[in-house]
Each structure stands twice: as C-alpha cells, then as structure tokens.
A protein has these predicted regions:
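Disordered, acidic Ser/Thr/Pro-rich linker "stalks" and the adjacent N-terminal cap
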Residues: 1-48, 66, 70, 143-144
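Hydrophobic beta-strand segments within beta-rich accessory/binding domains
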Residues: 45-47, 56-58, 113
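Trp- and acidic/polar-enriched beta-sheet ligand-binding modules for extracellular glycan
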Residues: 38-44, 64-144
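Secondary-structure boundary elements
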Residues: 51-54, 110
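A short beta-strand element within beta-rich, extracytoplasmic domains
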Residues: 53-68
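Generic detector of ordered secondary-structure context
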Residues: 50-51, 58, 105, 130
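Intrinsically disordered, low-complexity N-terminal regions enriched in serine/proline/glycine
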Residues: 15, 25, 53-56, 86
Length: 144
C-alpha cells in the first residue's frame, strides 16, 4: 500500500554548510537544504532508497517561513530522472510556499532532481535577497 518512502541517503551538487545539507529535505522539520550561494545554478539532488520502490508521486515544499521563502532562490523548472535509463519528467514549479505534487508512477531505486531554472530571491523590508537556492522538504510516496 501507498506510504511515505524515506531515502537512506542523498547527495547534493553543493550545500551552504553542514547545517543546510540535503538530509534536511526528508527530516519532516522546517530545516532546509540550501546550495552554496549559487542561486540554484547546476543544482542536482539525488536520493537513494534501500530497495526498488514503485513511486506514485513526490511532494516538494519550498521554505514555509515567508521571510526565507521571499529572500531565497527557489527551483522553477525541474527535471526528474531515475536509475531507469529511459525515465524523465519535467515540471515547472509554482513560485509559492504550498506543497506541490508531482506524479512519477515509476519504479526506482534512485531519484535525481535537477534544477533547470529558478525564481530569484527578492528584497524584503529593505533586506537584500539571499543568493542561496533553498528547499525545505521533499516527500516521496510509493509502494515497496
């Protein structure tokens, strides 16, 4: 039956420091992954699971806290691939801090998310935008 699937490990093309690692994306808290001030450029996030799982969908959550959401870069266009060589989904994410569902409907042991474009951070109350790409949570739903 369908249930949340938690990765056993992840890799990110970069992170701001250890406090902003990709593990924060599946810790069910409001901690975030942030890149190393690259504005989402060439971002790749890769998640590995203990077994091959049939993934129905994933849910991506930008920073819920409005100041972080406004001032950080956010993923816009993403490409999702897996260890199944012919599988690919491209999706344009909304520039908001609500949960966004993306249907996968594929078997995979590894899921890779590439950020192809981004929404820039914006000034807030006279404070400059951040240069970091930020994301709060990715939930994976599937059947093992």
């Amino acid at each position: 039956n369908l249930k949340p699937q938690v990765p056993i490990s992840c890799k990110a093309s970069s992170n701001f420091n250890e406090d902003f690692s990709c593990e924060n994306l599946y810790d069910e808290s409001n901690s975030m992954w942030q890149d190393n001030s690259l504005g989402c450029e060439d971002t790749v996030l890769e998640f590995t699971f203990s077994d091959t799982i049939y993934f129905e969908f994933i849910v991506i959550q930008n920073a819920e806290k409005s100041s972080s959401f406004i001032r950080n870069f956010k993923a816009r266009d993403i490409r999702i691939t897996t260890d199944q060589s012919d599988y690919q989904v491209e999706k344009e994410l909304e520039n908001d801090n609500f949960q966004q569902w993306i249907d996968l409907n594929t078997n995979a042991n590894t899921i890779k998310i590439e950020v192809l474009s981004a929404y820039p951070g914006e000034e807030l109350n006279g404070q400059n935008p951040f240069t970091e790409c930020a994301m709060q949570e990715i939930k994976f739903f599937g059947k093992s």
